[in-house]
From Swiss-Prot:
It holds the Pfam family SlyX. The gene is slyX. Disulfide bonds: none annotated. This is Protein SlyX homolog. It comes from the Bacteria. Coiled coil: none annotated. It comes from Rhizobium meliloti (strain 1021) (Ensifer meliloti).
Amino acid sequence: MMRDAEERITRLEETVAHQLKTIEELSDQLAEQWKVVEQTRAKLDRLTERFLSLEEQAQDATPVTRPPHY
């Protein structure tokens, strides 16, 4: 009976160790993904500013008119 309890405790300890390792790996992956999200967000902000600037410049430009023969 005591041997069964020891084996069970050993299995539980192994399971906990495996779960801790998995949690650590997932945490590292999450941190890496968060960096990618932040970089993507910064790039989107820059592209949005650039687009708005170009759109504003296009509104200020003289419109392209068709030649009279069209």
